[in-house]
Amino acid sequence: SLVSAEGPEVQKPNVVFILTDDQAPWALGLSGHPHADTPHLDKLFKQGMWLKKSYVVTPVCSPSRTSLMTSRYGSELGVTDWIHPRNEPDLGLNPKTVTWTEAMQSAGYRTGLVGKWHLGVPEKFHPTKTGFDYFMGFRTGGNKVIRPTLEVNGKDQQVDGYTYDILTDDALRFIDRNKDRAFLLCLHYRAPHTAWLPQPDSDRKPFEKLDPKIPNPDFPNLDIERVKRMTRDYLGSVKGIDRNVGRVLKHLDQLQLAENTIVVFTSDHGYSMGHNGIWHKGNGHWALKPAPSVTNPNIPRNQRPNMYDNSIFVPTAIRWPGKIAPNSTLDLPVANLDWYPTLLNLTDVPLPKGETIRGRDITPALMGKEIVWPDVCYGEYSTHHQSKTHMRMIRTTNWKLVRDFLNPERDELFDLKNDPAESRNVIAEKKNAGVVRELHTQILARMKAVKDPVLKKIKP
């Protein structure tokens, strides 16, 4: 709380930051999906500002979370793919970085993380060493959908119930304990990541007999029945997320905290479900029968690493009653890097001195000011588990260039104006040579700006 010159206390706004895992922008009723059932999310997105071009700079768990916490690229901090707890036991978020949660903690916020961490298992990477007073959840990337093993009060224990319900129960208790002071709650669900089953009847039943429409039914060799089955299961998981977000919002209403609470909803990356013949995210898998034959040892069978829009874009909204206009939208690109400076500005917390901040403070746009910045998205993904790549991407209004500096035969150019579904790679067409040169120059400039280690591997 702050004491103003006039005397009375001005309560700082609370922050509830909800992060899902593997949720695509299309997995939202409001997006026009024919089957997604998300009434609570649809309502939240209308109560504040819907960020329609919200994206992540790396479309996989750990690097995306690194960028969210630090406003830096994963390549700058040595986290370039999902952290494998067995093969990479000593990898995590560099404790020397100052996260935005640490800045809020230093400013007097009571901070809690409930749910998935995936930024290092050893004690030196523990969430309570990275700006959280309280942690309940799991440090690794995965967990069971039901009866998960969670860290509760510092000890691992198996907890009865569905994981998303258990995490929400704990989040509500955190809010209850801190309702009389300024708090930051980060609620990181693992859903709708696989595994999707089992699900409570309330989430599963509406989709059980559904014959879903799928995006690319005519894709050659697409395993249509499998894609339909996965779509049903995925939508049930999304419904479970929606139901639980509704519980959190209702709780804020009941405690009369909604007016003074900034609520952010977003995801760690997007997802494909049959789109372009694949399922999954940036480390995509073919959903074909049979999978294409292997032509490159770096890209094993069934793997389709990518930087598709469905992988990088995420469903995102921010609500702050009385400050951010309801039913508002923002059509300019907003990266996960941008939350760090933006949330600190919104809560009047100073930026930590000496920290490198790559993100843009989008506060003026949230407050309705007419403000414009370039319609450009830049991303990076060096896969090293399921495949081996060095993908770097630049996306403008009309074009997307994806360079794979390890496997140049995989380079892609998409004409987004005429082919928004990214179905045709037009990099070989002579008329596009100038576009490729220009975008390639932009990629190299971005790489140099962040001292990307892959620069050393590029042949001049």
Briefly describe each language-model feature range.
Residues 1-405, 409-412, 420-448, 452-460:
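Formylglycine-dependent sulfatase
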